């Protein structure tokens, strides 16, 4: 199927003056959250209102929402995993593992038990072997290595709908790999090989196990099928509507796309339903 070229008539630009949003996530009521390059968390409600929840003073990459309405985010500026309450209060949950500071904390998600998985991308320029890894952080803010990798700039992560696998985008390898959740440091398997020159960033699973892939380069959204094939879903050769797209959130029949190079989110109607998103209530982490 040929890729759809985005135009102003087939997509919506959401948000005004967002500060180069790298990540986006959805609340259970459809509220949209996005991060900014000065540590901002924006809330965009279903009626079109836009509100600045708070700032961390850093640079926010991946973010996700818990069951109490708090945002958890990778703050690469402060090299920390942070939590922002619905009122905007910021606390640092972790800054590294056993004396090993984070280098590039990049993306996060919760599993059904409330454990948070985090990619530390490592050194972008160490492209022969990579230095990235995957960590876990429990509800008491204890961080440890889950998979030592090394990953080649471990970026976006997504939990397979079966709950058995964690998928990771390797930006400098132009591929997607998976690791078993039941086996720390378990075998790493390439599931999707992307076209040469592609820089995958964020990934998100649909309920039918299709994997939506945001590409920092080119300005395109890909879909990875369960059989390992990959096709381009949307593209924007102008770089105006999609501008360095990074992370993606799947809504009911819509994709919400963060544009690190721009000032808005892009919303496109598409034949996708979201895989389960886990938003645990972390009472121990309450401010």
Task: Name each region found by the language model.
Residues 1-9, 37-38, 127-129:
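Blade/loop signatures of beta-propeller domains
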Residues 9-15, 48-54, 90-98, 142-148, ...:
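A short beta-strand motif characteristic of beta-propeller blades
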Residues 16-29, 38, 56-75, 98-119, ...:
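Beta-rich, blade/repeat-based domains predominating
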Residues 33-52:
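Beta-propeller domains
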Residues 37, 76-77, 125-132, 171-173, ...:
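Short, solvent-exposed loop/turn segments at conserved positions within beta-propeller repeat blades
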Residues 40-42, 80-82, 132-135, 175-177, ...:
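A short loop-to-beta-strand structural motif that recurs across blades of beta-propeller domains
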Residues 44-49, 85-89, 137-141, 180-184, ...:
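Short loop/turn segments that connect beta-strands within beta-propeller blades
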Residues 175, 192-229:
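Loop/turn-rich, solvent-exposed surfaces of beta-rich toroidal or solenoidal domains
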């Amino acid at each position: 199927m040929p890729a759809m070229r985005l135009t102003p008539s087939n997509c919506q630009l959401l948000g005004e003056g967002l500060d180069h949003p790298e990540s986006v996530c959805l609340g259970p009521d459809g509220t949209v959250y996005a991060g900014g390059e000065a540590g901002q968390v924006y809330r965009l409600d279903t009626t079109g209102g836009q509100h600045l929840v708070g700032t961390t003073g850093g640079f926010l990459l991946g973010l996700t929402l818990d069951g109490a309405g708090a945002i958890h985010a990778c703050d690469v500026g402060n090299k920390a995993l942070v939590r922002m309450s619905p009122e905007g209060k910021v606390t640092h949950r972790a800054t590294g593992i056993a004396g090993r500071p984070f280098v590039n904390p990049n993306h996060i998600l919760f599993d059904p038990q409330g454990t948070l998985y985090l990619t530390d991308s490592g050194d972008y320029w160490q492209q022969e072997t990579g230095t990235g890894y995957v960590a876990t952080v429990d509800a008491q803010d204890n961080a440890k290595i889950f998979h030592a990798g090394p990953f080649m700039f471990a970026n976006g992560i997504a939990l397979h709908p079966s709950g058995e696998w964690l998928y990771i985008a390797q930006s400098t390898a132009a591929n997607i790999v998976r690791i078993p959740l039941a086996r720390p440091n378990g075998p790493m398997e390439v599931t999707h090989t992307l076209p040469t020159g592609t820089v995958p960033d964020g990934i998100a699973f649909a309920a039918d196990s299709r994997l939506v892939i945001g590409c920092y380069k080119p300005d395109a959204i890909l879909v990875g099928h369960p059989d390992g094939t990959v096709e381009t879903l949307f593209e924007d050769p102008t770089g105006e509507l999609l501008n360095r797209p990074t992370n993606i959130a799947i809504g009911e029949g819509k994709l919400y796309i963060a544009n690190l190079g721009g000032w808005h989110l892009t919303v496109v109607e598409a034949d996708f339903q979201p895989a389960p998103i886990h938003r645990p209530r972390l009472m121990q982490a309450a401010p």
